[in-house]
């Protein structure tokens, strides 16, 4: 059997989190009544003229900076011509020959070590509307039409689904950390088209590529790529490669786990690109460039800092930088004086481990301040880890609350008063003089008995303090 390798390039569409659309002042809010966020511009009515949203340009520059790309201070918009019901103008305003960003890169972690994936270009464009199919008819919602997108086009540098997913997850984290998109995949704010081909290992030639459209979950992207590699490899082995693998667009059937032919893949010439006569070229001056290039700390830099400064395990650091909100919680807890190790345990293990499928960090009701206050009480010895779990359960049940008040109400405060603990310990030893003699004659297991008696009488003492005092008295 001939060994093959995959050749994978990805086109990612990121919907930007601007308040208004790219070429008009309509709202970009999600979930509104169909066709309510529309105007003559996004409806494509004759005579309506587009006006570029400056925030879109800024966000494109920010992404270009994050991927170490060239920011082209001169770029132009072009019309991409095609007919589809959700495209009222019969063309999409995009960029073609001169995009705003070019020649970037992302470093990803693979099983064989770090790898660079080259990014050919990032361009600004408007989104199309949405077709809704119901029975024998279809509806068109144009609320999404004219919503600002950045399309990020990689070079075909990935060789398997694992590398593709590593690239996508890295890009997904970056757009969220720099604040240009919420990248919500369920709402279609971060979606991917995968271009997949195969070739014999060692061959540098590029063979027929197939495009798989509109994938919006990491799991389905991986499955679609893996299926397509298997399909093309089987066609090659059977001698039917040229009949079965043609340049086309395919869809992934999530129920069956297979790709299905959708239409022949168009070449760029089929779209008849030409400069949009209604829009000026985009000129970026030095002031705007410098202003937009000030971006938040990137996930990779944050991870290095967490491992170096807080001695975190790499896996823990990777988890924290996978989501800006996780990193924000962690740093808020540190700012409250919680130890790094305690913060990771209570955020990544205790809190995340309790969140059910429909609950997220955003809507769970337990703020970073609440979780930090609880973790700090553990560090201070004012509550045991076991009792703190009960408090956390209560916070989740009631969607938040005052941590100290809950500790008091639930009677979970630990006694840290050394004098009070000494008195109780002495009382326990006095009342169990026979067992003290047995302990001193070698029955070490009785130490647990003394701890239990003291804890029972103290009703919530700090175990470490009780242990230390007992050791001192017995030894």
Swiss-Prot record:
GO term, biological process aspect, one: glutaminyl-tRNAGln biosynthesis via transamidation
Protein name: Aspartyl/glutamyl-tRNA(Asn/Gln) amidotransferase subunit B
Residue ranges of the TM segments: none
Gene3D superfamilies, alphabetized: 1.10.10.410, GatB domain, N-terminal subdomain
Top-level taxon: Bacteria
Organism in which the protein naturally occurs: Helicobacter pylori (strain HPAG1)
A GO molecular-function annotation: glutaminyl-tRNA synthase (glutamine-hydrolyzing) activity
HAMAP family: GatB
Family statement: Belongs to the GatB/GatE family. GatB subfamily.
EC number: 6.3.5.-
Oligomeric and partner information: Heterotrimer of A, B and C subunits.
Keyword terms: ATP-binding, Ligase, Nucleotide-binding, Protein biosynthesis
Catalytic activity: L-glutamyl-tRNA(Gln) + L-glutamine + ATP + H2O = L-glutaminyl-tRNA(Gln) + L-glutamate + ADP + phosphate + H(+); L-aspartyl-tRNA(Asn) + L-glutamine + ATP + H2O = L-asparaginyl-tRNA(Asn) + L-glutamate + ADP + phosphate + 2 H(+)
Gene name of the encoded protein: gatB
């Amino acid at each position: 059997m001939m060994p093959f390798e995959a050749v994978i390039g990805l086109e990612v569409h990121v919907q930007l989190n601007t308040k208004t659309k790219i070429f008009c002042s309509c709202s970009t809010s999600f979930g509104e009544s169909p066709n309510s966020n529309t105007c003559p511009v996004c409806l494509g009515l004759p005579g309506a003229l587009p006006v570029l949203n400056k925030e879109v340009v800024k966000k494109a520059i920010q992404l270009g900076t994050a991927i170490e790309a060239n920011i082209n201070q001169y770029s132009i918009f072009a019309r991409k011509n095609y007919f589809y019901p959700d495209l009222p103008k019969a063309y999409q305003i995009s960029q073609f020959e001169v995009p705003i960003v070019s020649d970037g890169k992302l470093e990803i972690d693979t099983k064989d070590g770090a790898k660079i994936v080259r990014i050919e270009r990032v361009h600004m464009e408007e989104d199309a509307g949405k077709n809704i199919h119901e029975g024998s008819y279809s509806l068109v919602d144009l609320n999404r039409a004219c919503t600002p997108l950045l399309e990020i086009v990689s070079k075909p540098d990935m060789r398997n689904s694992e590398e593709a997913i590593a690239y996508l997850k890295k890009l997904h984290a970056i757009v969220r950390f720099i604040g240009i998109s919420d990248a919500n995949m369920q709402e279609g704010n971060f979606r991917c088209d995968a271009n997949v081909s195969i070739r014999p290992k060692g061959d540098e030639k590029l063979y027929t590529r197939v495009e798989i459209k509109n994938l919006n979950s990491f799991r389905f992207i991986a499955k679609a790529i893996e299926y397509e590699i298997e399909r093309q490899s089987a066609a090659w082995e059977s001698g039917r490669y040229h009949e079965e693998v043609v340049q086309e667009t395919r869809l992934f059937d999530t129920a069956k786990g297979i790709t299905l032919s959708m239409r022949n893949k168009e070449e760029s010439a089929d779209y008849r690109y030409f400069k949009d006569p209604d829009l000026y070229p985009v000129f970026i001056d030095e002031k705007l460039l410098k202003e937009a290039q000030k971006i938040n700390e990137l996930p990779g830099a944050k991870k290095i800092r967490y491992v170096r400064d807080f001695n975190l395990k790499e896996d823990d650091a990777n988890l924290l930088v996978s989501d800006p909100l996780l990193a924000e919680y962690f740093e808020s807890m540190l700012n409250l004086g919680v130890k790094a190790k305690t913060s990771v345990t209570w955020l990544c293990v205790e809190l995340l481990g309790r969140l059910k499928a429909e609950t997220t960090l955003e809507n769970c009701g337990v703020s970073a301040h609440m979780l930090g206050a609880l973790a700090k009480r553990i560090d201070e010895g004012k509550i045991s880890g076991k009792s703190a779990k009960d408090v956390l359960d209560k916070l989740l049940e009631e969607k938040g609350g005052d941590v100290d008040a809950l500790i008091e109400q639930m009677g979970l405060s630990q006694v840290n008063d050394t004098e009070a603990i000494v008195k109780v310990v002495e009382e326990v030893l006095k009342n169990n003089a026979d067992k003290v003699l047995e302990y001193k004659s070698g029955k070490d297991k009785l130490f647990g008995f003394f701890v239990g008696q003291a804890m029972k009488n103290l009703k919530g003492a700090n175990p470490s303090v009780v242990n230390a005092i007992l050791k001192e008295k017995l030894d």
